[in-house]
Amino acid sequence: MSERNQQDGQFDKLTIKIASDDVIRNEWSRGEIKKPETINYRTFKPEKGGLFCEKIFGPTRDWECACGKYKKIKHKGIVCDRCGVEVTLSKVRRERMAHIDLAVPVVHIWFFKTMPSRIGNVLGMTSADLERVIYYEEYVVINPGQTDLERKQLLNDTEYREAQEKWGRDSFVAKMGGEAIRDLLASEDLQTQLVELKDKLRKTKSQQARMKLAKRLKIIESFVSSDNKPEWMIMSCVPVIPPDLRPLVPLDGGRFATSDLNDLYRRVINRNNRLKAILKLKTPDVIVRNEKRMLQEAVDALFDNGRHGHPVMGAGNRPLKSLSEMLKGKQGRFRQNLLGKRVDYSGRSVIIVGPELKFNQCGLPKLMALELFEPFIVKRLKDQGYVYTIRSAKKMIQRHAPEVWDVLEDIIKGHPVLLNRAPTLHRLGIQAFEPVLIEGKAIRIHPLVCSAFNADFDGDQMAVYVPLSIEAQLEAKLLMMAPDNIFLPSSGKPVAVPSQDMTLGLYYLMLDPLYIRENHELKTRVFRDSEEVLLALQASGSYNWYEEGSKSPNGENRSDYLRGIRIHEKIKLRTENGIIETTPGRVVFNTIVPKELGFQNYSLPKKKMGELVMQCYKKAGLEATVRFLDNLKSIGFAEATKSALSMGVCDVKIPTIKQKILHDAHERVAVVRKQYEDGIITEGERYSKTISIWTEVSDVLSEELFKLISEVKDSTMNPLYLMMDSGARGNKSQIRQLGALRGLMAKPSGDIIESPITSNFREGLSVIEFSISSHGARKGLADTALKTADSGYLTRRLVDVAQDVIITEDDCGTLNGIDVSAIKQGQEELLPLKDRIFGRTVCEDIYQPGDSTKLLAKSGDTLTVLQAEAIDDSGIESIRIRSVLTCETRRGVCAKCYGINLANSRSISMGEAVGIIAAQSIGEPGTQLTMRTFHLGGIASAGLTPEIVADDNGILVYTDLRTVKTDEGNWVALNKNGRLNIVKDEGRTLDEYKKLLSTKSIEPLQAFNVELGTKILLEEGTKVKPGTRVAEWEQHNIPIICDRPGYVRYEDLVEGLSTERDVNKQTGQAELIVKQHRGELHPQVAIYADQACEDLVGTYPLPAGAIISVEEGEFATAGKMLARLPRSAIKTKDITGGLPRVAELFEARKPKDSAEIAKIDGVVDFRGVQKNKRIVVVRDEMTGMEEEHLISHTKHLIIQRGDHVVKGQQLTDGLVIPHEILDICGVRELQKYLVNQVQEVYRLQGVDINDKHIEIIVRQMLKKVRVIDPGDTSLLYGEEVDKKEFEVENQKVSQEGGKAAQATPVLLGITKASLSTESFISAASFQDTTRVLTEAACAGKTDYLVGFKENVIMGHIIPGGTGFDRHKRVKMFVDSEQEQGLEFNFAD
């Protein structure tokens, strides 16, 4: 049902309710169907009174009744007196419905089987009990009368008969089946129930019971507040959908193809008719009951086949598609027909490269254009008087008359077309171009737009769409043309950057000088200006003639020939800024550079190219940039061709020292093997060390190889190096495999095979090496196929959760923001501050540190690149910026909190669909990530350096570091969160430095995070020089270290229970290993000051898997390793960690092996064991507050007794549970954690996504709160409501002087967040369709069509982008309705 808006015939809202029998019979239906027949198989005419009856549904032929008495349009509206058919259009058969009157009421399966069961909740009965009643197994008491039976009590046959004998037939009422349920529902008093439930809620203390009650209360409340009556969930008649929606199509050979629904309806009618017949006769009860049950099952199958019992099978043993299946899933009504419509005026063809095109053009095959623009051509042909009827125009077009081509040329001018390549992962997958007519049948596209479409020319196809209306053409022209889309919306980086051949040509042109005349005792040439250089180049005839001592082409001797100028010769050139040294090649390049950029005098790999394009856009504007890009394309292809670059097998050099290095490595591996056999190290360590040795060899050989191929000999360069260095093709790892060695490979399981492939591709692989190689290659391909689907699904969920987020106002006026700082890993800066703050709005005035007169940015400024750089250079560590996470706009977000539009570096416009842009920006690289695994062929990389080396002169200072000095004179770190700092030598004392560091008054030159067990080689306060080794750490084990000297005693190390002796097979050496156990033991090593073991110094709990390194009774010195826990063997770093990790974060799932985190600030203490778990206590010294943590033995503690921890710090290894961060540290910390964790995964892959996109998704995950105390509001305990709705409700109550409700924020995963949207249409089209619709119908929900999806489904213009203003009017109407106190609410 919908309310229409008179002026444009569009409705504003849609309400869904339960249909009562009255509505079905009197409002929807045109008549009752009594026969199961469909059509007469001889005449092919519909049977009367059957499922296709013309009397009920309307005529099968336009303006013709069934018997043929009336046959023309003039009889319109007459009902034939012979056959009873109304004379009208046959299309009414698509809209007229009928009904089937049932002999007994049946239960609608959705309301009974969709959990939580609505009927069960209203009646307060369990599903199992209901099922027994509905399917005629037991009686239920409806009215106990004077007996001592209870209402709703179940009775089986025997009990029912006994009760009748005991109290008499008419003393009580008990029934079974749908009828019984209907009577119960009708006699249910919902108002009293509500009062009772609220009363119970107030009295109960138990959480579980309260949740249960609140759930039930919500369902009953929804019935009370809507006009739905509970008994409508039981049907006494079934609606029949129009026949043309379930057609019966004759196939050749006299057979018919039919929709499954017809079979399901026939079953219902057959059973219903049989039941009616049986009821007329006096039939035994058992048979009647069975027949009634069969009717109930037939109706169930019609509505939702397979929900109850076995699904009904059709021909070929396939389950029939019921009404529910028609809606569900990818092939269902929502996703197939409403969201994924087909487009008219479209074509598709293979694409080929069109290097001659301009940036805004595409080549369109003539024949295709003729077909696509046909209506336009027809109109133009008529206007110009070539033809008079449409038919003759079409004929003219079919015979390809010459006039037609002229007309087509004319029409196409200024009429853009859209090109699209599937999969469309982000908005750059559809762009508009000016068509250029070409011969042939392939579409031509400009080489620079390929990267946006992710297209290549190995047979890709693209689709062409023609925008028809003037508005559509305008949008295409103004917003979608390729030149307007040269930056990625995800990061603001240019996407139209020359690649492959173009990069190669440009790099070749811009090479550093290869030929220096001074080396040949000649003078460097000097030129007046660029013109002169170009003239000299033209005159020199030859292009790159390098052969020493050879004859010139036309036989003159060499000295004469050298008057010619070489493209890579060093020359001097006069420019505006004085005389510079450059090469003729660079002069040629600078002829196309916009003058605003100045003279470019450096070599130009692909990375620099992107920066140059960006710079050009900022200094010279869009038009100049597009021109520049076109010129880059032309000159790049030209130079690549002229350079005649080729590559031969001999260009792949093999380092001469390869054999020696390999020999050394084999020896080192043998030493490790020997250590293992002697029992000094474990199997895991041996494996890890072997892998490390080979990784190192691989690196050393690569270095050698790159030295070798990057040499310039006789002013020529290695083409292989040229390709790699320019970024045109190939990367270091691939070239390493060609010339050095293939290196370590991974098994399909992800483990690294420890014997590497020592051959390279130039030498060729042996058979065994080939087999190992194929492992990696196959895994790559299999992964790709699987993960592409995963990634697509992630994008779909992201779009669904963020689709409603649009820019709805300019400034929400909030004072809140988030603090951002540069992202560092150890000492290197991964992402500088300027990149994180550029284009964002600052919350407060920012002054130069130490100079409060110099204002760097005013509060409310959107930072430009220059401002961002100035702030970064000034040494400010972190600044506060506005963010969508703190935006206070009621619906959508505001422009100030969002910042700039990355796609064009301008401020974001109203109505921009930033949510969808965010979802695409995160999802699109997801597919890239998944597709990127196999290029390395499963090559293993294990990165972590085992030593810390100083880079600067300075003084070594420890901070937050507990150390102990060992006998060898080193210091060992005892905790995990300490740092080593190297600070500038300013002649202060050590304590002063420490104080300055702790207050962040000085910045260390370098800061290293220190792992537990790191061996520090220098005392603090030592002066260090660059290259000094400061510390080293064991990368294969996590050590457990003794911090005070004493005698060792084992506690609870019981062999066979908590430990096992593992005899090393090679050596016979026994090792004591702590194993996982269930019991009251807590294995630890105790240290006593005396041999009698009375004076306890300290205890060290041992986690499962630890290998004990000390004997009982021996004297352990400080710093001695008591036990070691092998780090799990290194796995390859594949994105496999990536995509599932991103999904895990966005779905807010609990990670496997999660970490325990501290709930308060304080000092750590251990308190023994309880139920096989260690008790760790954190005690706040100031307040005396304590928090207990129970930690299982299998987890490794990363804190020691006496460590000071802060709230939210990890106590054990593993990943943190996001919900815990929310509970312990609050919303801000959680937001920061989620954004940083997601960014980390993408950064590892080198994918650049702006923070704001991830922030939008996180905002959507945190938009609900859970009510913990309803106060005087109408909210329920444990109910999850929108933050905004909660605030409105509280305002209302506090104005009336009542008690406000209390709530805590909840974190929802993206799937759950999408399903909990206010719009039931949007939720139903996403997932769980039946559940969403059932819930909405019970509550009589209204959808105000405010989001995108709902409007697409309804066929309205979407309320974003250019459709935004149009919906402003609707918003006014909604706001006025709200003021009148009508109840409804919006998605956030």
Curated annotation (Swiss-Prot):
It catalyses: RNA(n) + a ribonucleoside 5'-triphosphate = RNA(n+1) + diphosphate. Its cofactor is Mg(2+); Zn(2+). One of its GO terms (molecular function) is magnesium ion binding. Its EC number is 2.7.7.6. Binds 1 Mg(2+) ion per subunit. It comes from the Bacteria. Keywords: DNA-directed RNA polymerase, Magnesium, Metal-binding, Nucleotidyltransferase, Transcription, Transferase, Zinc. SMART domains: RPOLA_N. It comes from Protochlamydia amoebophila (strain UWE25). The gene is rpoC. Zn(2+) 2 binds at C812, C887, C894, C897. SUPFAM superfamilies: beta and beta-prime subunits of DNA dependent RNA-polymerase. InterPro entries: DNA-dir_RpoC_beta_prime, DNA-dir_RpoC_beta_prime_bact, RNA_pol_asu, RNA_pol_N, RNA_pol_Rpb1_1, RNA_pol_Rpb1_3, RNA_pol_Rpb1_3_sf, RNA_pol_Rpb1_4. Belongs to the RNA polymerase beta' chain family. GO terms for cellular component: DNA-directed RNA polymerase complex. GO terms for biological process: DNA-templated transcription. Mg(2+) binds at D456, D458, D460. This is DNA-directed RNA polymerase subunit beta'. DNA-dependent RNA polymerase catalyzes the transcription of DNA into RNA using the four ribonucleoside triphosphates as substrates. Gene3D superfamilies: 1.10.132.30, 1.10.150.390, 1.10.1790.20, 1.10.40.90, 2.40.40.20, 2.40.50.100, RNA polymerase II, clamp domain (4.10.860.120), RNA polymerase Rpb1, domain 3 (1.10.274.100). Zn(2+) 1 binds at C65, C67, C80, C83. The RNAP catalytic core consists of 2 alpha, 1 beta, 1 beta' and 1 omega subunit. When a sigma factor is associated with the core the holoenzyme is formed, which can initiate transcription. Pfam families: RNA_pol_Rpb1_1 (PF04997), RNA_pol_Rpb1_2 (PF00623), RNA_pol_Rpb1_3 (PF04983), RNA_pol_Rpb1_4 (PF05000), RNA_pol_Rpb1_5 (PF04998).
